[in-house]
C-alpha cells in the first residue's frame, strides 16, 4: 500500500471517529451555548476541521513516504494519539456536553500537539511547518474554549 493511501486511510478513520464521537446533536449543542464574542459560525468550524485533516494528511504522508525510517515512528504514533484525543474531545464537548471536562482535556491535548511538533522538527521540515500552522490555531482555540466555558459558567450561575 502506498503512503498516500495509508495517510488517507488514517485521516478518514480519524474523521469518522470524530463524527461518531460527536454524535448527531452538534448543531443543537452550538445553539444551546452562550458563545463568546468573535465566535465563528458552525460552518467555519467545519472548515477548520477540514483544514485540520489536511494538515494531518500532510504530516502522515510525509512520515510514511519513501523507505521506512524508525525515527519516524514516534511522530507517527504521536499523530495517531493526537487524532484519537481529538475524537475524545468531541465526545466530551458534543455528546457528553461536559464543558469543564472538554476544557480540562484540552490542556494535555495541547501539550501533546506541542510534543508532536518538536518531534517533527528533527524528522521532516515540511511536516513540521504544516503542523506549526495548527499550533498557531490552537492559541485561538484555547482562548475560545476558555471564554466559552467562562460565558456558560457565568450564565448558569445567573439563571
What does each model-identified segment do?
Residues 1-21:
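N-terminal signal-anchor transmembrane alpha helix
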Residues 2-9, 71-80, 127-130:
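Interfacial segments of alpha-helical transmembrane regions
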Residues 24-40, 149-159:
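Cytosolic, membrane-interface loops and tails of multi-pass inner-membrane proteins
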Residues 38-54:
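Interfacial helix-start motif at the membrane-water boundary
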Residues 54, 58-90:
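Helix-adjacent hinge/juxtasegments
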Residues 80-89, 102-116:
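Hydrophobic alpha-helical membrane segments
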Residues 91-99, 115-129:
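Membrane-helix boundary connector in multi-pass membrane proteins
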Residues 119-159:
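Terminal transmembrane helical module of multi-pass membrane proteins
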Amino acid at each position: 500500500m502506498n503512503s498516500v493511501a495509508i495517510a488517507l486511510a488514517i485521516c478518514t478513520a480519524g474523521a469518522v471517529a470524530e463524527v461518531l464521537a460527536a454524535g448527531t446533536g452538534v448543531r443543537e449543542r452550538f445553539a444551546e451555548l452562550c458563545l463568546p464574542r468573535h465566535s465563528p459560525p458552525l460552518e467555519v468550524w467545519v472548515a477548520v476541521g477540514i483544514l485540520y485533516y489536511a494538515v494531518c494528511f500532510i504530516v502522515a504522508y510525509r512520515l510514511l513516504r519513501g523507505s521506512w525510517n524508525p525515527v519516524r515512528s514516534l511522530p507517527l504514533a504521536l499523530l495517531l494519539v493526537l487524532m484519537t484525543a481529538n475524537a475524545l474531545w468531541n465526545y466530551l464537548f458534543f455528546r457528553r456536553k461536559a464543558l469543564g471536562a472538554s476544557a480540562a482535556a484540552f490542556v494535555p491535548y495541547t501539550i501533546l500537539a506541542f510534543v508532536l511538533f518538536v518531534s517533527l522538527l528533527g524528522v521532516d521540515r515540511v511536516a513540521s511547518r504544516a503542523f506549526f500552522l495548527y499550533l498557531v490555531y490552537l492559541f485561538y482555540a484555547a482562548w475560545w474554549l476558555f471564554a466559552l466555558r467562562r460565558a456558560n459558567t457565568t450564565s448558569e450561575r445567573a439563571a
